[in-house]
Amino acid sequence: MLGLDATTARRQGLQVLTGIINMASTALILHQYDVSPFSQKAQKMMGLKGLSWQSVEMPMIAPKPHVEALTGGYRGTPVLQIGRDVFIDNWMIARALDEIDAAGPAINAQGGLRDAALYAWGERLFTPLLHAALAAYQSEWEADFLADRKRVFPDVDFDTLDVSDPDRRSQVRAYLGTVEAQLGLGQDFLGGAQADSWDIHVWGMVWMIHSALPALMPIVETFPRLADWYERMLALGTGDREDVEIDVAWQALKDGPARPLPDTPDQEPLAPWVGEAVDIAAGSADRGSASGRLLAVDHEQVVLGVEPIIGEEAHVWFPRFGYHLKQRA
């Protein structure tokens, strides 16, 4: 999506499940591409927890046949696979990693409401950064890449984007100013002495500026605490990474376990849909619509059953908020 290569990107780079997921035998497979700030968030989660993981590189633009098969049609980045379980969006990825590594530093350490608010805050900051990136690089992109980005972000008027838009720069400065103020409370990280989801969500956006938006770096450089924090986040690393091919993921799907499904409460408005064919899609961008059988739904998550390989079912976990369901006709 951005104007940097994968090598540069890589360099810069609620309950415990007992007896269900064995870290020694069930690999963490991240389907992603390095130049996405959302992939960088997931990679930093691995570094925060000191985890070993495998990377399957997905294409930057559609079609993405392997990940679309795995998810039932969703093609956003990143996607975390653990055996037969497939986790969509960094919100679900963070929860999954906290569950399988309960002894390590917690990502969602301060409660669901705060973590959800921080997730939404990061999404809001992404908008002016996205517009800055589109304005800076669209003239350099090949026609198929530009067409894909116009499809993914249909609400953006690509023809009116201004590289030096002062209002956009002011918005970025406002967001980063709140980070600087929080760091002024005297802790190494935004929530205290230990990095958590707050830092992860800010990291992806500040990484994007450092890596691909040099025109915005003068704004970052006016905030000294933010600069020091960025170095501390860099030092966390990205865990122990191994690059693998898609065949490894298919074998993990065949051999791996599936975690227990959550109960669907009787009070859940979508409870009558359980067992039916549904579609689910993100509301903020066109990342593809996933189709499958609704297995469970509650206030935190939606689980679909899909069949990436004939006779092999995957359980695909989506966040409940930010994604919209409809019954298939």
What are these regions (language model features)?
Residues M1-N22:
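N-terminal amphipathic/basic-hydrophobic helices that include classical n-h-c signal peptides
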Residues G122-E231:
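GST-like fold's C-terminal all-alpha helical module
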Residues W229-D240:
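Short, structured interface segments
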